[in-house]
């Protein structure tokens, strides 16, 4: 990843800003309040009343958590934020794909990102709005920030969904499951089955140990279950937000604590299996400087081809955009 300087002295490492206080933004703000990672949080929304209401509602839970300052503000209030979480954008409607949202949300980003850039913010820009891969690339271009400081939540949630479903299927703690969803956060996403394991035991072997012989069939069902999760939830309750809020919290934790955790975040790829200049998710080391290193995990031929197809699908959308 093309890097920039480490977290600057002008940054308050315990301050976070959340731009957009819809379902995802407010749920993320709540998860961040509970995390104890920050002492200050500012919420920004085009609807100032909404931001003020969410800030008050979340702040009323502080006596049960840790002391911090939660306010609604404007772009001048984010200059010293260590992390700026961007969730603002139109939500996915039933039957709509994430890529269907492109033009609406690119237009929203064309008003938000320059506001951040012109204030010369030195924090990390974490993009959460969908389609996250496209919008992350748009944010890099519009901000002019170094690539290591602008990345998306990517397939962090998809990978968690995969671990959850595998844990349920195999009757094992989901935290012991090590498996990645890579590529687009969307319909062309790929399960990296060839590297999936349960505490070092390859998935296929673990299935047999658990008495599952038809594991190929089960794995395909699980892959489809992950891919269709959001559609299923949106159909039933109009939006998904709790899972992604936990993903946002996890990424922020890795940054603030400089954990150097490996997370499947969305960033511009450089010669990843021949993919160049397209933003998609691959595991990366995440710490206080944002993305420290992208990891080209071992993929079999079929997975490599699927990853290239995912990149092509995203590239076509990018070429259609006027940015």
Regions found by a protein language model. Name each.
Residues 63-124:
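Rossmann-like NAD(P)-binding element
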Residues 97-163:
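Rossmann-like NAD(P)(H) cofactor-binding subdomain of soluble oxidoreductases
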Residues 25-26:
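N-terminal Rossmann-fold NAD(P) dinucleotide-binding loop
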Residues 143-149, 158-323:
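C-terminal substrate-binding/catalytic lobe of Rossmann-fold NAD(P)-dependent dehydrogenases
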Residues 34-40, 144-146:
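Conserved S-adenosyl-L-methionine
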Residues 1-6:
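Short, Lys/Arg-enriched N-terminal segments with co-localized hydrophobic residues
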Residues 21-22:
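Glycine-rich Rossmann-fold phosphate-binding loop(s) that bind the pyrophosphate
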Residues 40, 44-82, 96, 315-323:
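Conserved N-terminal Rossmann-fold NAD(P) cofactor-binding segment
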């Amino acid at each position: 990843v093309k890097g920039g300087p480490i977290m600057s002295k002008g940054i308050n490492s315990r301050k976070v800003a959340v731009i957009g206080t819809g379902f995802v933004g407010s749920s993320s703000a709540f998860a961040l309040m509970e995390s104890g990672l920050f002492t200050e949080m500012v919420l920004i929304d085009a609807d100032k009343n909404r931001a003020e209401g969410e800030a008050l509602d979340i702040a009323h839970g502080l006596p049960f958590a840790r002391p911090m300052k939660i306010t609604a503000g404007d772009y001048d209030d984010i200059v010293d934020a260590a992390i700026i979480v961007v969730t603002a954008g139109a939500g996915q409607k039933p039957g709509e794909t994430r890529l269907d949202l492109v033009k609406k949300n690119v237009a929203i980003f064309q008003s938000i990102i320059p506001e951040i850039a012109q204030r010369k913010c030195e924090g990390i820009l974490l993009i959460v709005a969908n389609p996250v891969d496209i919008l992350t690339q748009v944010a890099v271009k519009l901000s002019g920030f170094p690539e290591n400081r602008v990345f998306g939540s990517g397939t962090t949630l998809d990978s968690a969904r995969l671990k959850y479903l595998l844990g349920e299927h195999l009757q094992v703690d989901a935290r012991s499951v090590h498996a990645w969803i890579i590529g687009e956060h969307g319909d062309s996403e790929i399960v990296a089955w060839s590297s999936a394991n349960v505490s070092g035991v390859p998935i296929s072997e673990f299935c047999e140990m658990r008495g599952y012989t038809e594991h190929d069939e089960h794995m395909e069902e699980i892959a489809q279950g992950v891919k269709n999760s959001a559609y299923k939830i949106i159909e039933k309750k109009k939006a998904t937000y709790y899972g992604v809020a936990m993903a946002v919290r996890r990424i922020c934790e890795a940054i603030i604590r400089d954990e150097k955790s490996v997370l499947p975040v969305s960033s511009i790829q450089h010669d990843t299996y021949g993919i160049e200049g397209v933003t998609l998710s691959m595991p990366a080391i995440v710490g206080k400087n944002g993305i420290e290193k992208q990891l080209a995990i071992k993929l079999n031929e079929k997975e490599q081809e699927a990853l290239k197809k995912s990149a092509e699908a995203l590239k076509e959308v990018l070429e259609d955009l006027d940015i």
